[in-house]
Amino acid sequence: MTIKILPARLANQIAAGEVVERPASVIKELVENSLDSGATRIDIDIEKGGAKLIRVRDNGKGIAKDELGLALSRHATSKIHTLDDLEAIMSLGFRGEALASISSVSRLTLTSRPAAQEEAWSAYSEGRDMQVKLQPAAHPIGTTVEVLDLFFNTPARRKFLRTEKTEFAHIDELLKRIALSRFDVSINVRHNGKVIRQYRAAKNQLQTEKRIAAVCGNAFVRNMLRIELEHQGLKLHGWITTPDGARQQSDLQYCYVNGRMMRDKLINHAIRQSYEMSLKPDQFAAYVLFIELDPHQVDVNVHPAKHEVRFHQARLVHDFIYQALADALAQSSVIDKPQVNESAFHRAEPEERESQPETTPQYSPQSVSTTVPERVYQAIDKTPTYPGRTDYEIKPRDRAPSDSSVREARIADSFKRTDWIESKLAPKPNVGKERHAEPAPSKREVHAYHELLKTPDFESQQAEQPTSIESVREVSLPQVTALGKALVVVDEQFVLMSSDSGVALVSLPRSEFYRTKGQLTPSEGALKAQPLLVPLSMKLDTDLVRLAQDYQQDFAQLGIQLKARNDKALMVMGVPAPLRQQNLQNLVPDLLSYAQTWMKGEKASTQMLPALIDWLAVQVTTVKSHYTLSEAIQIIAELEQLRHGQLPLDDKTFVSAVDFSATIAKLKP
């Protein structure tokens, strides 16, 4: 067989074997091109898992008409021109193979318009020699690449595609990695015409954490630690989880080198080594880490799909990552964790609880519980039982109660529950053994808290050095005018804040109540109602249906859309976002019954809306047993945003000034 130069299409199809493995590979190349073009918004349309259609549209710089033909040619790129450029590459793409390879195994159309060009042009290649054809098109500034019928001309490749669900799962995982690498870019994904993912651009810390939660889950955000370290031009930043956030599989491990997503053995080894003493053999660390260094110190051109890199100073990078993560984990383990008490799942009767001896959990820094069930045990174990509460008493029933009697009992209990939650949101008194099953804090927490808040013992000072009664003056705490910066969580329920006006202690349960109330309070017009996919129909008493009709506008102000089917049936068409996860089958009838009770009390109808907001806030607010500093910061930030900076600083159950003058005087020599 004689030696011949391969036709352009065949050569590109061979190259596509390395570049285009599956639909996710196509999207990776196209989205990376969009990011390199400076796009801030990327819209991705997919059909049949990418086998039928892949369309990627961006608002980047675009491609001039004269360069469209070159864009579909092999080894044509605007990102490098010399070997020095390759050694200092910072863009995601640089080989100039992607578009040519993709167009050789699909029907590809490239449409683009730069800002300096009044009209857009489309380019596509056809024939054995892949001649590029141009035609005018309508398109905004930016670029759209449409890929139809992937592998239509290579049946051997097409038959190896998996199911639509599997291929889309690969695409979804890829886009999660890209979404974490560029928080400043909005990414929208539609599959078969349905919006699947919407990653909005993050402009502040709260929005950044929301995107992390959207990709990694809320459990990751609850247990994450912020990492930021720089040494000799090597920078590491991102988030890792404490051992409490460990996973049963390595599905939340994202690492980036100079913005490029990586799976590098050196980096993985350093991370595993830093967690060696913290995780069990069947547990995996979860992290989102970014490594930045001089591009001359890393070679990115060592893998066909650019999944691996090679560091010139591999040992330095390895030890730097290991030390940074090991130090962060060591600092996070200062707060001791309680061991799990599984007996909390087996709730005793009130008489049994009173007869059981009171126990204090044992604490050990090494006994860090990490699995999801164990964290549930911890949460239940730390939930106190309250004297006189009969919520959990189980009493025999002679007959099943009617719906109306159940509702009346629930409404009566809701008034009691309002008082109970108000008391729980208020600062906790020192009730000692009255706390019953609530576990005691660790010795270190008790000591730190007492050192923070204790005042000098005036009686002992008077015994040692007698003074007149007039010399002892009552200390009046200053008025809190601003919250400022969160410093530390105290007693798991309060956060210490520092501002120019002084130091104050803020109740986090009370903050959660005000945050929920702010979410339920209309600010500019009515709350936005989110339509239910399936309207909820319920049978009610005639008077409740009539009440819903008479005060339909009031409920609409709260974002609750009610529609009467007849005089004994009501339909819930939509509710505001804070109520979407509630049991509407119980909540809506209870709300109507509460409103009816309010009106029977001869209250002014104009005052009913604030009363309903307060009632709903009490029902929706979930009080946690303990808070982390990141959760406290998020709660305060959202509260300030909802109330436009007008915080309830006059509420003594929400915030109280802390006076250190007596402690400072005691410490002075």
UniProtKB/Swiss-Prot annotation:
SMART domains: DNA_mis_repair, MutL_C. One of its GO terms (biological process) is mismatch repair. The keyword DNA damage applies. GO terms for molecular function: ATP binding; ATP hydrolysis activity; ATP-dependent DNA damage sensor activity; mismatched DNA binding. Residues 344-356, 390-408 have a biased composition (Basic and acidic residues). InterPro entries: DNA_mismatch_repair_CS, DNA_mismatch_repair_MutL, DNA_mismatch_S5_2-like, HATPase_C_sf, MutL/Mlh/PMS, MutL/Mlh/Pms-like, MutL_C, MutL_C_dimsub. GO terms for cellular component: mismatch repair complex. Pfam families: DNA_mis_repair, HATPase_c_3, MutL_C. Keywords: DNA damage, DNA repair. The keyword DNA damage applies. Residues 343-408 are annotated as: Disordered. Residues 357-372 have a biased composition (Polar residues). Belongs to the DNA mismatch repair MutL/HexB family. This protein is involved in the repair of mismatches in DNA. It is required for dam-dependent methyl-directed DNA mismatch repair. May act as a 'molecular matchmaker', a protein that promotes the formation of a stable complex between two or more DNA-binding proteins in an ATP-dependent manner without itself being part of a final effector complex. PANTHER family: DNA MISMATCH REPAIR PROTEIN MLH, PMS, MUTL, DNA MISMATCH REPAIR PROTEIN MLH1. This is DNA mismatch repair protein MutL. It comes from Vibrio parahaemolyticus serotype O3:K6 (strain RIMD 2210633).
